[in-house]
Amino acid sequence: MTTATSPTTAPAASFALALPAGWARLPARAEHERELTREVDRIVREALPDDLPRDSAEPLRRQLRRRLTDAVEEAGRAGANAVYLPASMDGFALPVSLSEAEVDDESETEPVRIVADLLTEAGQLDGLRDVDGAAAARTSATIASDQAEGSWERTWSKRVVYTVSVPHRPGRWVVLTWSAVYGDEPSERLADALVELFDAVMTTFRWTDVPGADPTPVELAVAAAEEAR
């Protein structure tokens, strides 16, 4: 379970999302630099434990720390509030990431109209979704890149975006972007499965800051987890 509160101009939207065990939320805003450093250090320790030979492991730690920090800071400059990454298992991490952002719409257009416009522009009229009572657009695209990654000479990214209106914060939208990278036929099948995983994760999305509403079981669980930290 992970929770998120946007550091954009208040009032912000808070929500809970159930991600697979081991995923880390890395804050991408400059004001949360210390928290980012703490999370990156934790990920590096788990990926490259202290019992590894220092001479060979330390350069890898520095490289991983730099790559993670640079990627998250770049996402922050692009407007993201946070980036979510899967845990590494036996030295392997799934080639997937999730970014979280919030945007404001100063027009008085109804959310359903905005969702319809987004889906029409994308040519994906079947992407209308209800996310915990909020109108949302699900859009997808495959992005090609000439940049090599590992053994792949060229890569593609299956990108799925949920643009969700915040029903209790007029004009506020939560944007969640899932990106699964692949470079050959077997990894493309994995990317397809990861897209299905994201759609399943989005069924767990719950608002946690609805004014006047009694605390939900999700909110109570989140509060208990925060107190236990």
Annotate each predicted stretch with a short phrase.
Residues T37-A71:
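Mixed-charge, low-complexity intrinsically disordered segments
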Residues T69-V166, T216-P217, A225-E227:
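Signature of long, low-cysteine stretches enriched in small and polar/charged residues
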Residues A28-D41, G212-E219:
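Short acidic, Gly/Pro-enriched loop/turn segments at secondary-structure junctions
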Residues T2-L17, P111-R113, L190-V195:
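Short aromatic-glycine motifs in intrinsically disordered, low-complexity regions
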Residues A28, A101-E102, R206-V210:
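Short beta-strand-to-coil "C-cap" segments at the C-terminal boundary of structured domains/repeats
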Residues W23, G123, W178-R229:
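Surface-exposed amphipathic alpha-helical segments
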